[in-house]
Amino acid sequence: MKAQLKKFILLSLNACDGLPMPQSALVGAVQNLARPGQPTKSDVEDALKAVEREGFCEGVSDEFSETTWTLTTKGIHQARKL
C-alpha cells in the first residue's frame, strides 16, 4: 500500500501545477484516491516523509501556517511518468 500512497502523493502534487499544497489538503486528497483502502492520516504522512527522503518533494513550514508541499524537479519528472 505504501508504494500506492507514494504514487498518489506525486499525482496530487502534480495536479497543483507548482502551487504549494497544504498538508491537510494533501492527506485528504491521497485518502480519497486510495479508496477503498482507507489509509489513516499516519499512513499517508509516513509515505509523504518517504517521498521527501527520496527527493521527490519538499515541505516548507513556518509559524503562520501548516506545512505546504511541492514537487522537486525530480518529483515532477517522476509524476509525469505515472
Feature-to-residue mapping (PLM):
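Short amphipathic alpha-helical interaction segments
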Residues: 37-53, 66
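A short, conserved structural fragment
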Residues: 52-62
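Intrinsically disordered, low-complexity serine/threonine- and proline-rich regulatory segments
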Residues: 1-5, 55, 69, 81
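Short alpha-helical segments that sit at the start of domains
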Residues: 1-21
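Minor-groove-contacting beta-hairpin "wing" of winged helix-turn-helix DNA-binding domains
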Residues: 64-71
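Cationic, hydrophobic amphipathic alpha-helical membrane-interacting segments
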Residues: 33, 62-64
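Short acidic, hydrophobic short linear motifs in intrinsically disordered regions
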Residues: 19-32
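Short, amphipathic alpha-helical interaction segments positioned at domain boundaries
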Residues: 73-82
